[in-house]
A protein has these predicted regions:
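ATP-binding pocket architecture of kinase catalytic cores
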Residues: 1-94, 98, 104-109, 132-133
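Active-site catalytic-loop/activation-segment of kinase and kinase-like phosphoryl-transfer enzymes
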Residues: 87-127, 190, 194
Length: 280
């Protein structure tokens, strides 16, 4: 398959670097057959056109997700500091700021009160602190069913050029609490427990207490949910791409559920309730 990136907008080098890291870890990422970096042209092996998202159902989800978890563990086991940009406080904060800037101010056309701003600021500080306290590994950053291909070996992994070195729970929450498909909480817990058990056996630095690992997983997911709400609004209003706002209720549901389970996040739960009453 040919990849032709506009020279003025795209740098192919991160893609090539992360592809090499994935393949070295034993993950099925596209292999580069030929390249012309000056013209931003790549010739890649084809992983097919069947995404996880296009075929996922109740009957096959466990099999597909078990394969995805195995590939994720291989990727994380290959982690080395200095290979990828850090998922640091500045990046986490920029992502969280997308929520008030694009979802609240632009989509809802609301101005937060000083009390609401403080509640959001305090919550973001908690989320960032917990994220940075997690062990750091390679993070795909969009390890979700739309970017996993049904292939042999399974899965094929794409859209990895924004990979970073950061919180160990991030890719798992991207996989199991997706933008475009939702699962029962019991099933998400089962997948998280399967990952945690296998990761522990293989020597990854997950918390030895599953309840603490799951708390990290949930709080990391909340940071991602706020980010995605902002991104989807930005895609709609700035980039003029329709369809994304239709999936924002799923992320509000994720965020509300997590915020409602933890006493420290109660101010965010109240803020979400207030925002939902003002939906356009």
């Amino acid at each position: 398959i040919a990849m032709d990136a506009p020279p003025e907008r795209e740098d192919c080098r991160p893609f090539l670097h992360v592809a090499a890291l994935l393949r070295a870890a034993g993950v099925n990422a596209p292999q580069v057959i030929a390249q012309d970096l000056a013209r931003r042209f790549l010739l890649l092996t084809d992983l097919g056109d069947t995404t996880y998202l296009s075929v996922l159902n109740e009957a096959n989800a466990d099999r597909l997700f078990h394969d995805a978890i195995e590939a994720l563990i291989k990727w994380q086991l290959a982690s080395r500091e200095g290979e990828l940009p850090p998922y640091d406080e500045a990046l986490l904060r920029r992502e969280c700021n997308l929520f008030p800037e694009w979802y609240v101010a632009r989509h809802l056309a609301l101005r937060l009160s000083s009390a609401q701003q403080q509640a959001l600021s305090d919550t973001v500080a908690l989320l960032i602190s917990r994220s940075l306290a997690q062990p750091a590994v390679f993070v795909h950053r969009d390890y979700m069913p739309r970017n996993l291909m049904v292939s042999e070996p399974n899965p094929g992994v794409i859209d990895f050029q924004d990979a970073v070195h950061g919180p160990i729970s991030y890719d798992l929450v991207s996989l199991t609490r997706d933008a475009f498909v939702s699962w029962e909480e019991a099933r998400v817990i089962d997948w998280a427990a399967r990952y945690w058990d296998k990761a522990k056996q293989r020597g990854l630095p997950v918390d030895p207490d599953f309840s603490e690992f799951y708390r990290n997983f949930e709080w990391m997911g909340l940071q991602r949910h706020l980010k995605v709400l902002g991104i989807f609004a930005r895609i709609h209003y700035r980039d003029g791409k329709g369809g994304y706002l239709e999936d924002t209720p799923r992320f509000l549901n994720y965020a509300r559920a997590v915020a409602g389970r933890y006493r420290e996040l109660a101010p965010l739960a109240r803020l979400i309730e207030q925002l939902e009453q003002r939906q356009p």
